């Protein structure tokens, strides 16, 4: 059964080693990595609460090059092209990926805004 995983770049870095498993076993998984340069949700929480952004910005990693290193088909995308790039990725056999370079916002304020 095909799997679609949508993950931020910060969280994705906790499980990079699993790319080897996906590649070795030709797992039918498509990854969409939202590359916003750090722990975006934590950055949002800190900003909403009026705190300075601390410990949430990461060194930029070329995620497309990482997927290439594992010989996993990958496309870079941006918001206006995501639908087409995702359709391409879902057509691939075995693992595939789309790297979306964008900053997404939380749809609703967190409870931290009330602090």
Language model features by range: what are they?
Residues 1-115:
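Thiamine diphosphate
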């Amino acid at each position: 059964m095909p799997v679609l995983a949508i993950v931020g770049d910060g969280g994705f870095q906790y499980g990079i080693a699993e790319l080897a498993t996906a590649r070795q076993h030709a797992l039918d998984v498509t990854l969409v990595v939202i590359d916003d340069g750090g722990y975006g949700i934590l950055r949002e929480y800190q900003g909403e609460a009026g705190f300075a952004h601390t410990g949430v910005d990461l060194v930029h990693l070329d995620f497309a090059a990482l997927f290439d290193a594992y010989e996993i088909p990958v496309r870079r995308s941006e918001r206006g092209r995501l639908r087409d790039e995702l359709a391409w990725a879902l057509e691939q056999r075995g693992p595939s990926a789309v790297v979306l370079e964008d900053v997404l916002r939380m749809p609703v304020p967190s409870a931290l805004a009330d602090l």
